[in-house]
Amino acid sequence: EVCTYFYANKQSYPKVLEEQVRASVARTEKQLGKKLGDLKKPLLLSVRSGARDSMPGMMDTILNLGLNDETVEALATSSGNARFAWDCYRRFIQMYGDVVMGVQKLQGEEHDPFEHIIDSYKEELFPKEKGEIDDNRLNVSQVKELVSRFKALVKKRAGSDFPTCPWEQLWGSVGAVFGSWMNDRANVYRRKYGIPASWGTAVNVQAM
C-alpha cells in the first residue's frame, strides 16, 4: 500500500508512516538494548525489498545503516576489531552512495567509481605488485583512508555530503528501495515472469 501511495503521490509517504516507522525502530531498540545513532551501543539496520513475489537481485538493498564517523568507533570497540568496523562503514558508504545518492559509473567510464578508488589506492600502496591485490591486505588506517576518499567522491558526484544522521540514512534508503521497484532490471524481470507492476513492494527494515 505504501509503495502504491509513493508512486501515486510524487514519491511521498502517507502521514502516518513516520510515526509507525519510529515506533517499530523503538521496539527493536528495546528488544536488542541498542539505539539508532547511540555512541556506545548503536543499532545497525538493513533495508531491503519485501516484494510479494521473489525477485532475486533485482531490487536494491542497504546494509549497516546507522554507521557514521562516531558510531563506527562504537562498533570497533564492541566487536574488538577496528578493521572490521571501518570496512563495514566503507561498504555502507559505497552501497548508500550508489543506491541512494546515484554515485554510479558515468558514460565513458569503464569501472564503478568506488571500485576505481580501491584499485587506484592499492596500486599506490603496492606499486611493484602485479595482478589483483586482495582487499584484506589493507590495514585499518588504510581502510580509513578509503572511507575518506569515498566520502569525497560522494560529495563531488552527488553535490552533497554523505549523511551522518541515521534517520536521514534510513529515509533515504526506504525511498531508494521503493524507487528500485521501477528500475530497468526490475521492469524487465517482471515482464519476463508476469509479475504485475501494480503489486508494488514492501520495504523490510531489520536489525543487522
Give the location of each predicted region.
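Nucleotide/phosphate-binding sheet-loop regions of phosphoryl- and nucleotidyl-transfer enzymes
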Residues: 1-208
